Amino acid sequence: MRADWIAKRRGQANVSQMHYARSGVVTEEMAFVAARERLEPELVRAEVARGRMVIPANVRHPELEPLAIGITACCKINANIGNSAVTSNIDEELAKLRVCLKYGADTVMDLSTGGDIPQIREAILRASPIPVGTVPIYECLAHVKDVADLTPELMLEIIEAQAAQGVDYMTIHAGVLRDFIPLAAHRITGIVSRGGALMAQWMLANKAENPFFTHFEQICEIFKRYDVTFSLGDGLRPGCLADASDAAQFAELKALGDLTRKAWEHGVQVMVEGPGHVPLDQIPMNMEKERELCSEAPFYVLGPLVTDIAPGYDHITSAIGAAVAAQHGAAMLCYVTPAEHLGLPDIDDVREGIVAYKIAAHAADVARHRPGARDRDDALSRARYAFDWNKQFELSLDPDTARAKHDETLPHEAFKSAEFCSMCGPKFCSMKIHGHLAEAAAAQDAAANGAAGKPAGGLQVLP
């Protein structure tokens, strides 16, 4: 859908949405997301210009349907897919992408670390109408025997190749600096970010500063030529509750704020990644800290997980934290699956993670009174009161699961219009009883008030 929009920008040195927004231009992408978000196009332009909203939309990704990530937009969720060094299957990753699209992921990240990484990414990009993100350091590592052998030139080459292929946003771990590494020494779990650990290993081996940091200006030049959005990686994020909100985390966050403003000087869009594992009571403070240090750039958080004791259920432990984070200003939530800390997610894990995070994001949108956020809740509630089971399934986040649960005990089609479920049966359904009471009260009022020539009162039931 974007081919004609993109064609008009050929030959321009900076094609980023921020550049156009600061020039006073409402791009087609801005107008498109304004309609999706029920916002005025001028407000979208102003938010992109200010840096509080990003529209990840590489000009080499014409298949993309643009979306907005920012405090004035609905909360978005990201789903991670991609192979590991021990499993490599393009068809399986495309199947995961289809699950992401079916269940409503807003963006997807290809975190492949093995096999033909560019080929896998190309297949995902060409099949994806949603923004695609990557972590370039993973592909960089595939080109060398040891992380110490990485060169800034190779890293820039890989970044440019991914940008030219159409990647919409990239996680760049530029805030992990040499001086910060000792700050993580006291932690229970140390450095848990793969990208953060790799950069720390490189710096210690080469006795040099992080090349993503020293070559940040060159990365900005690449990004503005393709309109790639920075997702500034939190390489020192806490990996357990005990490590949350420590000196290492906040030293890096301050550096990410400085890098955010440097990218903005180039007219490049930025979002900032956040923790991690954080006790529930510390989440609001963490959101406020990011706004303060990073000049209100959109915050993209992984969870956070609010307890460490539930392997196999970390889609739940993290969705709890994600809902609180989103209520307090997080713009995008990176999903966590039941396989977190245990292994590579399969398709069922992907589905469960997406649904858990759609719930978290939606709950936050309702709490923040986003335009139209509660419409679907109200429609489903009306269908529930009317015993319209098929409408309830249709309106649910996961219609297949909702229908399957109902079918477990009442599988026949006749029960899809029954005024009860298997929990209460026909005699104990509270809504059915209330409906009969409402009808009786209305009939009594009509008879009494009709005889007296008065308007009916009594028990009122909304449709």
Swiss-Prot record:
GO CC annotation: cytosol
Cofactor(s) needed: [4Fe-4S] cluster
Entry superkingdom: Bacteria
InterPro entries according to UniProt: ThiC, ThiC/Bza_core_dom, ThiC/BzaA/B
Catalytic activity annotation: 5-amino-1-(5-phospho-beta-D-ribosyl)imidazole + S-adenosyl-L-methionine = 4-amino-2-methyl-5-(phosphooxymethyl)pyrimidine + CO + 5'-deoxyadenosine + formate + L-methionine + 3 H(+)
Pathway: Cofactor biosynthesis; thiamine diphosphate biosynthesis
Free-text comment on the cofactor: Binds 1 [4Fe-4S] cluster per subunit. The cluster is coordinated with 3 cysteines and an exchangeable S-adenosyl-L-methionine.
EC id: 4.1.99.17
Binding site residues for substrate: N80, M109, Y138, H173, S193, R194, G195, D234, G235, L236, R237, E273, Y300
Binding locations of [4Fe-4S] cluster: C421, C424, C429
Quaternary structure, from the entry: Homodimer.
Record's function text: Catalyzes the synthesis of the hydroxymethylpyrimidine phosphate (HMP-P) moiety of thiamine from aminoimidazole ribotide (AIR) in a radical S-adenosyl-L-methionine (SAM)-dependent reaction.
The protein, known as: Phosphomethylpyrimidine synthase
Source organism of the structure: Anaeromyxobacter sp. (strain K)
